[in-house]
């Protein structure tokens, strides 16, 4: 993946230049809306949960992202977070997501979003990075915003079943070296703004389908092969700051995930359920 990482770095370095060139005052008439917009965020969270599973070993997460959008609907973005424990793909202590897509306004209240997320793990092993196309349909009605989405990662080595269980991974003995597998994730989100308050109630549910073993780096996108994740929470916004508190859980029990240990555990020492229910708090600053 070294070649692809170099391509990603070059693309990211050109984003600010492209944005500056396209949004300069010389190309926009006074009073008109810029054709290119740049937005970003920085956040601190008590844990980084990806589809209900901790990627920071149930410890603090520091995250940030930037998006460059064009009024045609095209956009590119970059998002990153620290990692620990199970989340460290091939020894990487950082996740870097390169995102590109297109948003189409279907009506005043409906938007279709089609794109691709490229999950990068700088400093990790060779077989870590993988690509995942997605599609999202979002609609609004009154104070409610509803989203339905699907993300499908085609067969790739980084998400293949190289180990049948955690014991094989701990011993470093591949059961299926070079294996490629795919992964499907379907989800739904709901957000309801509470009238007269800065609070928005939020709910999420998703289901993952993938291989039931461990990949080349003793991790997996869909631990146990298939599971549900869900969350209930609320946002409170003040100016450009958003405080969120959510309860997050999955239906992966400690007993069910036992065969994936020690990889699938806190500290990767065989103890603790990193997919169990937890209260997560985060503070995000938008700019």
What are these model-derived regions, one by one?
Residues 19-40, 49-55:
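Outer-membrane beta-barrel biogenesis signature
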Residues 42-46, 64-70, 98-102, 116, ...:
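Residues on the lipid-exposed face of transmembrane beta-strands in outer-membrane beta-barrel proteins
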Residues 44-50, 80-84, 104, 118-122, ...:
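Transmembrane beta-strands of outer-membrane beta-barrel pores
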Residues 50-57, 86-94, 123-131, 158-167, ...:
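Outer-membrane beta-barrel translocator domains and adjoining extracellular loop/strand segments
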Residues 72-78, 108-114, 143-148, 196-201, ...:
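Repeated loop/turn-to-beta-strand initiation elements of outer-membrane beta-barrel proteins
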Residues 74-129:
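Surface-exposed loop and membrane-interface regions of Gram-negative outer-membrane beta-barrel proteins
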Residues 130-222, 247:
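Detector for outer-membrane/organellar transmembrane beta-barrel domains
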Residues 236-239, 271-287:
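Outer-membrane beta-barrel "beta-signal"
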């Amino acid at each position: 993946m070294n070649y692809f990482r170099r391509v990603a770095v070059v693309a990211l370095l050109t984003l600010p230049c492209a944005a500056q060139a396209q949004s300069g005052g010389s190309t926009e008439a006074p009073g008109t809306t810029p054709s290119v917009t740049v937005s970003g965020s920085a956040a601190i969270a008590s844990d980084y949960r990806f589809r209900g599973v901790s990627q920071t070993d149930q410890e603090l997460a520091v995250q940030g992202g930037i998006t460059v959008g064009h009024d045609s609907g095209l956009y590119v973005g970059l998002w990153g977070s620290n990692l620990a424990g199970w989340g460290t793909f091939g020894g990487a202590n950082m996740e870097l997501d390169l995102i590109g897509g297109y948003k189409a306004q279907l009506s005043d209240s409906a938007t279709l979003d089609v794109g691709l997320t490229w999950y990068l793990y700088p400093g990790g092993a060779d077989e870590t990075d993988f690509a995942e196309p997605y599609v999202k349909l979002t609609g609004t009605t009154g104070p409610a915003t509803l989203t339905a989405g699907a993300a499908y990662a085609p067969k790739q080595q980084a998400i293949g079943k190289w180990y049948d269980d955690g014991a094989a991974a701990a011993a470093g003995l591949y059961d299926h070296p070079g294996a490629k597998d795919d992964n499907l994730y379907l989800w739904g989100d709901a957000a309801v703004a509470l009238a007269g308050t800065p609070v928005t109630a939020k709910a999420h549910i998703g289901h993952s389908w993938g291989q039931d073993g461990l990949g080349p780096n003793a991790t997996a996108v869909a631990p146990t092969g298939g599971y549900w994740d869900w969350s209930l929470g609320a946002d409170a916004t003040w100016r450009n700051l958003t405080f969120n508190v959510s309860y997050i859980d999955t239906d992966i029990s400690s007993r069910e995930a036992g065969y994936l240990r020690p990889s699938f555990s806190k500290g990767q020492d065989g103890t603790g359920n990193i997919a169990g229910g937890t209260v997560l708090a985060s503070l995000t600053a938008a700019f």
